[in-house]
């Protein structure tokens, strides 16, 4: 079975990468479009500068270099596809490789800040009252 070709609003990835930023902005949802029309913030420009630096660089193991950033409000653009970003979630850098399907999303959507809590069974040390629970 043939592999489905990715299209964003009717355009292939190659067509999107050839477009100017203004043309791509017009294809994005309204919230992202308004944000990008105001221009990039300094921290967002820093992410774009880091991308240019590591464009063709690889680390010792042959994997692409991870671009670490705290900027969770950066919008994924077509020229970011294929890069690996370390997005900070408040505790650690979550490695995310940008796929074509992520275009138009925010970085923060891919690095969750809250995890699901799975509480343990009550026992010694769980609470102050558990000191009086008999040991098994």
UniProtKB/Swiss-Prot annotation:
Q: What highest taxon heads this organism's lineage?
A: Archaea
GO CC annotation terms, alphabetical: cytosolic small ribosomal subunit
For whether the record's keyword set contains rRNA-binding, the answer is yes
Glycoprotein as a keyword of this entry, yes or no, is no
Q: Which GO terms describe its molecular function?
A: rRNA binding; structural constituent of ribosome
- Do you know which InterPro entries this protein is assigned to? Ribosomal_uS19, Ribosomal_uS19_CS, Ribosomal_uS19_euk/arc, Ribosomal_uS19_SF
Q: Which GO terms describe its biological process?
A: ribosomal small subunit assembly; translation
Keyword line? Ribonucleoprotein, Ribosomal protein, RNA-binding, rRNA-binding
A matching Pfam family: Ribosomal_S19
Gene3D superfamilies recorded: 30s Ribosomal Protein S19, Chain A
What is this protein's function per UniProt? Answer: Protein S19 forms a complex with S13 that binds strongly to the 16S ribosomal RNA.
Q: Which family does it belong to?
A: Belongs to the universal ribosomal protein uS19 family.
Q: What is this protein called?
A: Small ribosomal subunit protein uS19
Lineage of origin: Archaea, Methanobacteriati, Methanobacteriota, Methanomada group, Methanobacteria
The coding gene here is rps19
């Amino acid at each position: 079975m043939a592999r489905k070709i990715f299209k964003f609003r009717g355009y292939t990835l190659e067509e999107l990468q050839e477009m100017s930023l203004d043309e791509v902005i017009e294809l994005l949802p309204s919230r992202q479009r308004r944000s990008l029309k105001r221009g990039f913030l300094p921290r967002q420009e820093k992410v774009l500068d880091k991308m240019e630096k590591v464009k063709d660089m690889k680390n010792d193991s042959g994997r692409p270099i991870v671009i670490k950033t705290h900027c969770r409000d950066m919008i994924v653009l077509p020229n970011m596809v294929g890069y690996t970003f370390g997005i900070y979630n408040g505790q650690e850098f979550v490695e995310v490789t940008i796929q074509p399907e992520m275009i138009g999303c925010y970085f923060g959507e891919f690095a969750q800040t809250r995890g699901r809590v799975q509480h343990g069974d009550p026992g010694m040390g769980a609470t102050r009252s558990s000191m009086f629970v008999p040991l098994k």
